[in-house]
C-alpha cells in the first residue's frame, strides 16, 4: 500500500566533482522492511547513503527522493535527521574535547527542538542515556569519554548504535557498519539494530559481506553496480553473491 512507503527513490543520479557516481537508482522501502545494498568497491553504495543524508559535496543531477511523502532533496541535512533519518558511518569521526554525554544531550535536544518539543530535563536525559547504554552493552564510564577518542573499531561502532538508540530514527542507514568488527562486536551491533527495529521503521544495510546479514536478516537484497541497481531479490541473493561473486550475477 502507498501509505506504507517510507522512502521512494526514482531515477536518482548524483555526482561528485563532476564525476557521475549514481546513474539512475530506483528503490522503494516500506515500513518494517530491512533492505541490504551490496556491491563491489566503487559501485556507489556509500554515495547513495551520503546523498540520502544530504552531504553537501554530492550533487544530485536528476531524479526524486521522497521520505514519508516529503521531498527529501529539498531538506537540509538537519531537517532530514529531524524527520527521522540516521546515518551510521563507515569510519566514525573523533571529536576531541566533547564528551559523549554532552554530544548526545545536544543531539537529542536538537531533534526535539526540530519537532517543536521542549528539551529533556537533566534527570530524564540521564535516565534515558543509562537505559540505552545498557541496551547496547556499553559501560557507563564511556559517558565521560570524548567522542570516539581512543576507541577501538568495535567501540566506535557500538557508540554509533547507542546514538541510534538515543535518536530513535524511522529510517536507519548503516554504511558498512561491520567494517573492522570482530565476531563478538558484530553480534552486539547487530543485536542492537535488530532490537531497535519495529514494524513502523526501516533500515538500509550497506555491506560487502554476508556475515553481517547472517545476524541482520534482510527482507530485500539489492546489488548496486556501476551506479545502478542491477539485481533485486530476497535474502537468498546473499548466498548467490557469496557463491558467484558480483561479475557472474
Segments (PLM) and residue ranges:
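ABC-family P-loop ATPase nucleotide-binding domains
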Residues: 93-170
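Short hydrophobic beta-strand immediately N-terminal to the Walker A/P-loop
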Residues: 35-37, 49
Amino acid at each position: 500500500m502507498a501509505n506504507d512507503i517510507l522512502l521512494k527513490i526514482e531515477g536518482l543520479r548524483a555526482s561528485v566533482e563532476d564525476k557521475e557516481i549514481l546513474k539512475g537508482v530506483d528503490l522503494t522501502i516500506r515500513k518494517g522492511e530491512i533492505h541490504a545494498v551490496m556491491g563491489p568497491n566503487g559501485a556507489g553504495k556509500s554515495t547513495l547513503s551520503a546523498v540520502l543524508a544530504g552531504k553537501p559535496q554530492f550533487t544530485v543531477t536528476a531524479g526524486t527522493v521522497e521520505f514519508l511523502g516529503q521531498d527529501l532533496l529539498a531538506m537540509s541535512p538537519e531537517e532530514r535527521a529531524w524527520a527521522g533519518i540516521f546515518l551510521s558511518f563507515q569510519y566514525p569521526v573523533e571529536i576531541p574535547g566533547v564528551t559523549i554525554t554532552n554530544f548526545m544531550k545536544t543531539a537529542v535536544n536538537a531533534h526535539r527542538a526540530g519537532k517543536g518539543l521542549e528539551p529533556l530535563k537533566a534527570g530524564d536525559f540521564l535516565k534515558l542515556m543509562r537505559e540505552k547504554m545498557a541496551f547496547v552493552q556499553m559501560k557507563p564510564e564511556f559517558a565521560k569519554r570524548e567522542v570516539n577518542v581512543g576507541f577501538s573499531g568495535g567501540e566506535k561502532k557500538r557508540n554509533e548504535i547507542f546514538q541510534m538508540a538515543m535518536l530513535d530514527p524511522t529510517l536507519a542507514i548503516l554504511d558498512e557498519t561491520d567494517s573492522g568488527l570482530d565476531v563478538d562486536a558484530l553480534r552486539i551491533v547487530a543485536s542492537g539494530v535488530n532490537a531497535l527495529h519495529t514494524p513502523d521503521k526501516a533500515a538500509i544495510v550497506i555491506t560487502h559481506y554476508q556475515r553481517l546479514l547472517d545476524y541482520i536478516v534482510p527482507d530485500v537484497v539489492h546489488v548496486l553496480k556501476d551506479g545502478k541497481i542491477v539485481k533485486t531479490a530476497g535474502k537468498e541473493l546473499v548466498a548467490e553473491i557469496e557463491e558467484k561473486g558480483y561479475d557472474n550475477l
